[in-house]
């Protein structure tokens, strides 16, 4: 018989060893952890948790306050994991911040595919080089998922898409689109060209081809390269790709990388 609510465990001490996954979750502390090696990430809020579970990520446990207990208990009814419940003050003491989105859940990571596994079935991919802002990574994943991209590929130094802030900014869309991390960069560019992709490098350079003037064949496979805020794409990457730009006006030369990703993904979407 399926359960209708999760098994709840009331906690009263921030030192409870069962809560180790939730201690010191501020962004500064998270950056000090080898979180990918530990094999977990934190899903924050009912919506993000729901999307993570739907995508097949297994929950290890969850932490919530009594105010949010009813919906979270129903959501985790069949997860067979403890749902820890404490006061809002205790949750803040444990995590280091005010938990205002209802709940946190410690989730097990899934094995990442190799880029070469994603490319054959993809027609549109976003490639990020050295984008180390979790906020920008999360926003770009949301753009990519919502604007018809098939996958996101990351250079080795890009921020982790499953960090708490990335997941939150993406509204859980990091779970909706496949992604992979190149083992070597910029050598990974060869994987794109070998798979038949036309590689486009987004740049504010005035000599680049405007996106609205770009000629795209119906059967073109496109890889959109985006660089970090400020520094942009490296010279090696720009030299190996076709430079494209967003036409700008009003004396503004460029957009934030997440905003630029949204414009470019829309411009490069499949016809129809």
Give the predicted meaning of each segment:
Residues 8-15, 82-87, 178-187:
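Short acidic-hydrophobic, aromatic-tinged amphipathic segments that line or gate anion-handling sites
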Residues 70-80, 236-237:
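Short, aromatic/basic amphipathic alpha-helical patches
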Residues 76-103:
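Glycine/small-residue-rich loop that forms an oxyanion/phosphate-binding "nest" at active or ligand-binding sites
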Residues 6, 110-207:
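RNA substrate-binding interface of SAM-dependent RNA methyltransferases
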Residues 103-106, 143-147, 161-174, 235-272:
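Structured adenosyl-cofactor binding patch, chiefly the S-adenosyl-L-methionine
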Residues 1-70, 158-159:
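Boundary-proximal intrinsically disordered activation/regulatory segments immediately upstream
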Residues 200-252:
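Active-site/ligand-binding-proximal alpha/beta "capping" segment
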Residues 11, 41, 129-130, 155-156, ...:
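Glycine- and other small-residue-rich loops at beta-strand/loop junctions that grip anionic moieties
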